[in-house]
Design a protein with these regions (language model features):
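Active-site and donor-binding regions of nucleotide-sugar-utilizing enzymes
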Residues: 4-151
């Protein structure tokens, strides 16, 4: 059975690492043929570019950023499944401004699923950018960081 490579960029370790590690550990429980590559975005991306023979890939992006459009195209062209779990977002009304809707729908076409923090964000997307649902799937999942707080 061919290995699936699961890429997990993590640049702000103090904020993101524990939550990303929980994601990795929960995946390991259910999938046996997966190899994880976790590190800074630069390190992870360099590994992908260097290893052109990898066929099955999953990339857990930290959010959708138009600066990385060419990178998303590169990953999609290689057959990589791209998922997003933003590390910034609002779960409270006062944080609503943290959610950016300045997203290129061409990028959304390349992203398999977007995991979002709250119903508040989901409802904002429905209200302001309903057309996003024509390009990608959005699921309210919360963030593993909150799971760490509850245990």
């Amino acid at each position: 059975m061919e290995n699936i490579y699961f890429f997990v960029p993590c640049d702000i370790y103090i904020r993101d690492f524990d939550a990303r590690l929980i994601t990795v550990l929960s995946t390991i429980k259910d999938v046996t043929n997966v190899k994880f590559v976790i590190g800074s975005q630069h390190q992870v991306n360099k590994f992908i570019i260097k290893n052109k023979n990898i066929k099955k890939m999953i990339y857990l992006e930290k959010g959708i950023d138009t600066r990385y459009s060419s990178w998303y195209y590169y990953l999609a062209k290689r057959g990589c499944l791209i998922y997003t779990l933003s590390e910034e977002g609002g779960i409270f009304e006062k944080n609503r401004n943290l959610v950016s809707f300045d997203i290129d729908t061409d990028n959304l076409d390349l992203i398999k699923k977007n995991f979002i923090w709250s119903n508040l964000i989901y409802e904002e997307i429905i209200k302001k950018k309903k057309n996003f649902f024509n390009h990608s799937e959005f699921l309210v999942t919360g963030n593993p960081r909150f799971d760490l707080c509850s245990e």
